[in-house]
C-alpha cells in the first residue's frame, strides 16, 4: 500500500511512520533552509538524482553511531596518533561538499550532491546548522565530511578522501568534537558496512524518532564550533 505524500508550500512533513519500507516518505517542495531544518528535526532528508523531483526519505531501520560507544581499531588509532595531517572544522565547507560530489562521479557513481543541494547546504552552513570537518596535508585538502547538527544530533551526509584513511580520521575527529559538544547521536542514514568497524549500530525507525524528540528541543541557531 504505497502512499507517497506530495509536499505543498508550507514546510511541514508527514509523520515518519508513513515512510515506505525503502524509506521514501514524500515528494516535492523545495530545499529552503526552513524546510530542511523541519525535515532533519524528524530525521527526514532529501536524496534524489538529477532530473527527478525532490524525494524525501526516512530510512528505517537507521544506522547510527553513539559517540560514547565509538570504537576504532588499534591499527587505525596508531595511525591516527602518528598522523601529520591537520584537522579543522568549518574552514572549507563549500570545497568539502563539492569534493564529496565530484569524488563519486570520479568513481563512475551517480552523485545526489547536485548544484541546488550544494547551494541549500551552503545556506544551512551560513546559518550555523551545517558543518564540515577538513583533513589537510599541509595546505592541500585530502579528506572531509559534512553534515547537519541540531541539538544533540549530528546527521552525517557524505565524506570523501583522496588519500588512505583521511575520511576515517575525519570521523574520529568528528566524534572527539561531538563528545566535547554534548552530541549524543550521529546519524549515518544508510547501513554502510565500513562503519561497522566504528561501532555503528542499527536501530529501529521508532527508536531513532524517540531519540530525536529527546535530543532536539527548541532549536535556536547552533553555537559556533570552537576548537
UniProtKB/Swiss-Prot annotation:
Cytoplasm: present as a keyword of the record? yes
Give the first-level EC class, as a single word: transferase
Q: Report the EC code(s) recorded for this entry.
A: 2.3.2.6
Q: Can you say where in the cell this protein is located?
A: Cytoplasm
User: What UniProt keywords apply to this chain's record, in alphabetical order?
Assistant: Acyltransferase, Cytoplasm, Transferase
Q: Which SUPFAM superfamilies match?
A: Acyl-CoA N-acyltransferases (Nat)
A GO CC annotation recorded here is: cytoplasm
Record-linked InterPro entries: Acyl_CoA_acyltransferase, Leu/Phe-tRNA_Trfase, Leu/Phe-tRNA_Trfase_C, Leu/Phe-tRNA_Trfase_N
Q: Which transformation does this protein catalyse, written as a reaction?
A: N-terminal L-lysyl-[protein] + L-leucyl-tRNA(Leu) = N-terminal L-leucyl-L-lysyl-[protein] + tRNA(Leu) + H(+); N-terminal L-arginyl-[protein] + L-leucyl-tRNA(Leu) = N-terminal L-leucyl-L-arginyl-[protein] + tRNA(Leu) + H(+); L-phenylalanyl-tRNA(Phe) + an N-terminal L-alpha-aminoacyl-[protein] = an N-terminal L-phenylalanyl-L-alpha-aminoacyl-[protein] + tRNA(Phe)
- Any GO BP annotation: protein catabolic process
Q: Per the record's keyword annotation, is Zinc included, yes or no?
A: no
Gene Ontology molecular-function annotations: leucyl-tRNA--protein transferase activity
PANTHER family, from UniProt?
Answer: LEUCYL/PHENYLALANYL-TRNA--PROTEIN TRANSFERASE, LEUCYL_PHENYLALANYL-TRNA--PROTEIN TRANSFERASE
**Family, per the entry?**
Belongs to the L/F-transferase family.
Q: What does this protein do?
A: Functions in the N-end rule pathway of protein degradation where it conjugates Leu, Phe and, less efficiently, Met from aminoacyl-tRNAs to the N-termini of proteins containing an N-terminal arginine or lysine.
What is this protein identified as?
Leucyl/phenylalanyl-tRNA--protein transferase
What is the organism of origin for this protein?
A: Desulfotalea psychrophila (strain LSv54 / DSM 12343)
UniProt lineage: Bacteria, Pseudomonadati, Thermodesulfobacteriota, Desulfobulbia, Desulfobulbales
Q: Which gene encodes it?
A: aat
Amino acid at each position: 500500500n504505497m502512499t507517497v505524500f506530495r509536499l505543498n508550500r508550507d514546510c511541514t512533513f508527514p509523520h515518519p511512520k508513513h515512510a515506505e519500507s525503502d524509506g521514501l516518505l514524500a515528494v516535492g517542495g523545495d530545499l529552503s533552509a526552513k524546510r530542511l531544518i523541519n525535515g532533519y528535526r524528524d530525521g527526514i532528508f532529501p536524496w534524489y538524482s538529477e532530473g527527478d523531483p525532490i524525494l524525501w526519505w526516512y530510512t528505517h531501520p537507521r544506522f547510527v553511531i553513539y559517540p560514547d560507544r565509538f570504537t576504532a581499531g588499534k591499527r587505525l588509532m596508531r595511525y591516527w596518533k602518528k598522523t601529520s595531517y591537520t584537522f579543522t572544522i568549518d574552514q572549507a565547507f563549500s570545497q568539502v561538499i563539492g569534493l564529496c560530489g565530484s569524488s563519486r562521479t570520479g568513481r563512475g557513481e551517480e552523485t545526489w550532491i547536485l548544484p541546488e543541494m550544494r547551494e541549500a547546504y551552503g545556506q544551512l552552513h551560513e546559518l550555523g546548522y551545517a558543518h564540515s570537518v577538513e583533513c589537510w596535508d599541509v595546505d592541500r585538502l585530502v579528506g572531509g565530511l559534512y553534515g547537519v547538527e541540531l541539538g544533540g544530533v549530528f546527521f552525517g551526509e557524505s565524506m570523501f578522501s583522496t588519500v588512505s584513511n583521511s575520511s576515517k580520521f575525519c570521523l574520529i575527529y568528528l566524534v572527539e568534537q561531538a563528545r566535547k559538544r554534548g552530541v549524543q547521536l550521529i546519524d549515518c542514514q544508510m547501513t554502510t558496512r565500513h562503519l561497522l568497524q566504528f561501532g555503528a549500530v542499527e536501530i529501529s525507525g521508532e527508536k531513532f524518532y524517540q531519540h530525536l524528540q529527546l535530543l532536539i528541543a527548541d532549536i535556536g541557531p547552533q553555537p559556533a564550533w570552537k576548537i
